[in-house]
């Protein structure tokens, strides 16, 4: 144990303040889903511990993140993909009369709607989702002029800081500035330094690199005070040249990507991975709607895959990840999460009616889930590759068999392992304006589930769940449902779940139902349940579950589901434990 010689009350205060900050530091928080299984809509399973191996403490993942939507929110949103399906002749005609005026084009609609990035409900969702993914750092786009979008990054810091207090391992933050040592870049750096860093605001969220807060910017014309405060890594704007100065980092490249900042041992600090690139073989840098642009389904190996649903698979994304995983790099920087906005110009790079950065579902580069289309496929693809890059903790083994009395006292659950932890604080309600003409409300957050366990003996399997506050009445609709994937096979049941408890509100006993196919259920039996305060337990006879001698299944809790039969509801409404498509695994050893 370390000892400290505190010489003054001021010194004691500094130590206490440092300790408080440290409590919520990313390194001391746990990624609750790091060991959990999930299967995406395409049937792709997340890699397990026996595939990716132990967690590597020297590997990091950064993600490009956009904070400037609020500045455009007075405009109505226009879905470019949907618009061009109705007006294909407007594709290269800037003055086509069908193009609406006073709008902001989106390549498609985000899952959470046309939100403004000061919407705290959305920011909390991002905090959880990126924590679950294992993202270490998000980097804000401040590459246009000297605008740094302070209201949005401060709103995010406030929400992420609150999420940390609830145990959520949110990413750290950093800024990407303009690609050059310009007056605008100098001004932007000064703004974030004076407004955020110098006063020490949200210090626990700063991403540190080589002992200092990281900033992706050019240091050439920066005042000494600021220059000495940050680790500077100037951004290389070009996609195909690699580093042109020793301290260059990339933000997006075409395949095969270069390593940036070579270390003494031959490894590299950084490499980029992108979902798509506004680039063509013929002309290099081009708008996303240029013929031959490298969309989501383009690969260097096979060119453009023109199958209708090719965008679902992230072929471009995976080719870049496969390359990065073969290299020895410290940090993979992924572009990107949530740009969404598709700027339209009369000409750009000699292209008429140009969409430089985002265009449509195929020619876009966001990973954040969308409504319809590829939904959350890219999100789970990101998680899968982060696991391959960083490894993962070994899953905790189940404790010995134990009989639970079902007496409503719950003391017998104390030493049952594993103890599955779920995000706390995520039942907040939403009431916020989006882009012009949109307003979003969501009041479905109800029972905030924070912990789950399973026990078993020769006759029964027991399930336990705990909430942050007192449970609501079991007569509430869609109350505390338990989904069980008994064979760990997504092809059976509904989204892999073969059984459900509490799809119908329980009475004296709970109803156990089996899927006949999809969201069609047939009652199997009535089973015992108890709940008191913030704890609930359910007992199911093994015979009803058609279990083999050795247990090996997955399960999930859901409260206040709104759209029966739609698994995407798990990302939007009520609360689930664990989040999204993740499940808790339970296996006898």
How should each PLM-predicted stretch be described?
Residues 26-73, 204-206, 222-227, 231, ...:
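N-terminal module-boundary/linker segments of secreted carbohydrate-active enzymes
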Residues 34-40, 104-119, 135-147, 172-183, ...:
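The substrate-binding groove and active-site-proximal loops of carbohydrate-active enzymes
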Residues 47-158, 335-336, 340-367:
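N-terminal carbohydrate-binding/catalytic regions of secreted carbohydrate-active enzymes
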Residues 54-73, 213-316, 320-333:
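Aromatic-lined glycan-binding groove of carbohydrate-active enzymes
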Residues 56-62, 133-138, 166-173, 202-204, ...:
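Loop/turn elements at helix/coil->beta-strand transitions in domains of secreted/extracellular proteins
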Residues 163, 346-410:
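Aromatic-rich peripheral "rim/lid" segments of glycoside hydrolase catalytic domains that contact
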Residues 396-407, 483-507, 542-589:
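Acidic/polar low-complexity flexible segments
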Residues 408, 459-469, 535-542:
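Short, well-ordered beta-strand segments enriched in hydrophobic/aromatic residues
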């Amino acid at each position: 144990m370390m000892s400290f010689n505190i010489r003054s009350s001021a010194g004691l205060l500094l130590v206490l303040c440092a300790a408080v900050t440290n409590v919520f530091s990313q390194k001391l928080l746990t990624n609750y889903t790091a060991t959990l299984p999930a299967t995406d809509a395409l049937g792709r399973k997340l890699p397990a511990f026996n595939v990716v191996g132990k967690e590597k403490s020297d590997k990091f993942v950064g993600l490009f993140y956009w904070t400037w939507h609020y500045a455009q929110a007075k405009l109505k949103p226009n879905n470019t993909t949907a618009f061009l399906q109705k007006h294909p002749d407007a594709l290269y005609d800037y003055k086509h009369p069908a193009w609406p005026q006073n709008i902001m084009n989106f390549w498609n609609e985000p899952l959470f709607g046309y939100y403004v990035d000061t919407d705290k409900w959305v920011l909390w969702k991002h905090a959880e989702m990126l924590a679950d993914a294992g993202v270490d750092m998000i980097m804000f786009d401040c590459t246009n002029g000297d605008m740094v979008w302070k209201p949005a990054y401060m709103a995010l810091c406030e929400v992420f800081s609150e999420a940390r207090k609830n145990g959520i391992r949110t990413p750290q933050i950093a800024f990407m500035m303009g690609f050059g040592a310009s007056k605008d870049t100098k001004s932007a750096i000064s703004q974030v330094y004076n407004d955020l860093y110098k006063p020490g605001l949200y210090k626990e969220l700063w991403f540190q690199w080589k002992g200092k807060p990281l900033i992706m910017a050019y240091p050439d014309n920066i005042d000494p005070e600021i220059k000495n405060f940050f680790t500077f890594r100037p951004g290389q704007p070009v996609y195909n040249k690699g580093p042109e100065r020793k301290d260059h980092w990339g933000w997006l490249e075409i395949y095969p990507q270069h390593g940036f900042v070579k270390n003494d041992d031959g490894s590299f600090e950084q490499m980029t991975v992108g979902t798509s690139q506004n680039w063509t073989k013929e002309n290099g840098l081009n708008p996303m709607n240029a013929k031959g642009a490298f969309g989501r389904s383009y690969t260097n190996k096979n060119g453009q895959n023109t199958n209708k649903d090719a965008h679902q698979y992230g072929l471009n994304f995976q080719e870049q990840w496969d390359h990065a995983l073969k290299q020895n790099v410290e940090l993979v920087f992924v572009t990107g999460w949530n740009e969404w906005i598709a700027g339209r110009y009369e000409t750009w790079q000699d292209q008429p009616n140009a969409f430089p950065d985002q265009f449509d579902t195929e020619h876009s580069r966001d990973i954040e889930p969308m409504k319809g289309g590829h939904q959350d496929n890219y999100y789970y693809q990101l998680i899968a590759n982060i696991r391959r890059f960083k490894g993962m903790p070994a899953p905790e083994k189940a404790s010995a068999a134990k009989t639970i009395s079902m007496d409503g006292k719950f003391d017998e659950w104390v030493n049952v392992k594993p103890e599955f932890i779920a995000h706390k604080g995520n039942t907040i309600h939403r009431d916020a304006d989006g882009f012009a003409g949109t307003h979003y409300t969501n009041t479905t957050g109800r029972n905030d589930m924070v912990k789950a366990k399973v026990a078993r003996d020769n006759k029964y399997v027991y399930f336990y769940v705990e909430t942050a506050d007192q449970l609501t009445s079991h007569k509430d609709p869609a109350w505390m449902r338990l989904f069980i994937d008994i064979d760990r096979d997504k092809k059976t049941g509904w989204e892999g779940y073969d059984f459900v408890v509490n799809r119908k509100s329980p009475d004296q006993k709970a109803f156990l139902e089996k899927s006949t196919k999809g969201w069609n259920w047939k009652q199997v039996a009535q089973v015992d349940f108890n709940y008191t305060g913030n704890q609930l337990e359910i007992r199911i006879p093994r015979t009803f579950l058609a279990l083999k001698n050795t247990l090996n299944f997955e399960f999930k809790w859901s409260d206040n589901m709104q759209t029966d039969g739609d698994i995407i509801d798990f990302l939007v409404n009520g609360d689930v434990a664990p989040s999204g498509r993740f499940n808790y695994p339970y296996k006898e050893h």
